[in-house]
Amino acid sequence: VGNGNRFYLKPAAAVSTARRAGTTATWDQLNKYFGLMQMPIVTSQYWNLVHGGFGGQVEQDVEGLQTMRTLARNMAFMLKCKQVALENGVAMPEREKSTFTNFVR
């Protein structure tokens, strides 16, 4: 799928926002792309979403903002861990060449 090395093992986090419904389905779909690229998915204490319909309303979503702060700390931790590992000789996992098959043979 394209240049698989570009995103390989780069921590990723999807965030979705909406007035009401639809954010969890969007978040699920975005995370699938990270999985295809072998990207560790960074999470928070809840799904990475906030609610608000107009400018300034997201700032009123206290739980959503807490989720974003936790997500930011978790992302920073993952990036620091990766950097420390690389600086101390922890090798990236060996990648296998992709094999493509049909579900039915």
Annotated model-derived regions:
Residues 40-105:
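Glycine-rich phosphate/pyrophosphate-binding loop and the adjoining helix
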Residues 1-46:
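Helix-loop-strand module that forms the ligand-binding subsite of alpha/beta enzymes
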